[in-house]
């Protein structure tokens, strides 16, 4: 039995299969991340003090509160409040009446947490939100 045709078929089809399957494996589907799931994914990806490595699978006590302290003053805090996660919601600061409409419109337009919750985010999207 002559194996030359089989060998040539593998030689010719091998690289074609590698090229065809390569980009599909590199692309990742966006994942919808809301509330504390968004924060945890961001911390795992970006890193953070103490609670970023949950190596044994157990969450660190008070982890959500520490996450909020880390995010204080960051552009993501408003996104967490807008996502409506009752565990993470802080009391919003009162705004003057005249600026409430503009603030809401601006927050909706540039709110990464809301975008990740509604449309989903890839790992690369989350990397752009890392502070360092």
UniProtKB/Swiss-Prot annotation:
Q: Where in the cell is it found?
A: Secreted
Q: Name one GO cellular component term.
A: extracellular space
Where would one find the signal peptide in this protein? 1-21
A Pfam entry, by short name: Insulin
User: In this chain, where does the modification Pyrrolidone carboxylic acid occur?
Assistant: 27
Q: Tell me the disulfide pairings in this chain.
A: 34-117, 46-130, 116-121
Q: Does the keyword Secreted apply?
A: yes
Tissue expression per record: Expressed exclusively in Leydig cells of the testis.
Query: Any idea which UniProt keywords this protein has?
Result: Cleavage on pair of basic residues, Disulfide bond, Hormone, Pyrrolidone carboxylic acid, Secreted, Signal
Q: Does the keyword Transferase apply?
A: no
Q: Which residues form the propeptide?
A: 67-104
Q: Which GO terms describe its molecular function?
A: hormone activity; protease binding
The family database entries (SUPFAM superfamilies) matched by this protein are listed as: Insulin-like
Q: Name one GO biological process term.
A: positive regulation of wound healing
The record, for InterPro entries, names: INSL3/INSL4, Insulin-like, Insulin-like_sf, Insulin_CS
What's its job?
Seems to play a role in testicular function. May be a trophic hormone with a role in testicular descent in fetal life. Is a ligand for LGR8 receptor.
This protein's assembly is summarised as: Heterodimer of a B chain and an A chain linked by two disulfide bonds. 20% of B chains include an extra N-terminal pentapeptide.
**Family assignment from sequence similarity:** Belongs to the insulin family.
Return the protein name: Insulin-like 3
Q: Please give the organism.
A: Bos taurus
